[in-house]
């Protein structure tokens, strides 16, 4: 499907959020990309690096006109963020995230959505030794796995838009139950990043082959 958003708002413009913004802008997938954060110097750097078009420090202002909101802050801040600005989202908006923990957080996020607003959980498995928007790259997600965690109530059109967005980043998109995601990621969390990523890729390939004995 052809993908284009009038406004994408990224809440938390660090390595992941900044890299996503760079891709959205380079590929023309959004008319404007707005960054939301608390540190103005970081947001100014994000503009200079091409990660966002403009920034605001008031999240309510930042999300009000957004077609898509990407929550790219630490997962332990999700509840605070959604409580603060979810009611400001326009009808038809989509909210997604990039967090490494799903499960209950996905359920909480869905409950926080106003009528007509849709949440789709996502976890791009990509990173670098360095963090922050200065380490961002429009190649960060190329060839990486991105796990999307829909539920029974996920809006199909919103799901497809989020899936397509991550495919546009060069990611290989995998769909998985949120709680199963947490079990698998928890099992590999003690491994070095390279080994963990390799194991996730192997599990994804097994799933893609649709082997009946493995419910992945």
Q: Where do the PLM segments sit?
A:
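Short beta->alpha hinge that forms the Motif I/post-I loop of the SAM-binding pocket
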Residues: 38-39, 73, 98-100
């Amino acid at each position: 499907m052809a993908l284009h958003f009038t406004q994408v708002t990224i809440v938390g413009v660090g390595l992941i959020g900044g890299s996503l913004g760079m891709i959205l802008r380079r590929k023309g997938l959004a008319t404007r990309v707005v960054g939301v954060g608390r540190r103005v110097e970081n947001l100014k750097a994000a503009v200079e690096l091409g990660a966002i078009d403009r920034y605001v420090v008031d999240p309510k202002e930042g999300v009000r006109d957004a077609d898509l909101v990407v929550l790219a802050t630490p997962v332990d801040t999700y509840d605070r963020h959604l409580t603060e600005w979810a009611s400001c989202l326009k009808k038809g908006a989509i909210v997604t995230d990039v967090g490494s923990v799903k499960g209950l957080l996905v359920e909480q996020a869905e409950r926080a959505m106003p009528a007509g607003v849709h949440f789709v959980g996502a976890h791009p498995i990509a990173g670098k030794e360095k963090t922050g928007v200065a380490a961002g790259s429009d190649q960060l997600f190329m060839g990486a796995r991105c796990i999307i965690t829909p539920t029974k109530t996920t809006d199909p059109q919103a799901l497809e838009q989020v899936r397509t967005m991550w495919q546009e980043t060069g990611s290989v998109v995998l769909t998985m139950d949120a709680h199963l995601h947490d079990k698998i990621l928890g099992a590999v969390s003690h491994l070095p990043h390279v080994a963990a990523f390799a194991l996730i890729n192997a599990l994804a390939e097994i799933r893609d082959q649709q082997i009946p004995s493995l419910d992945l």
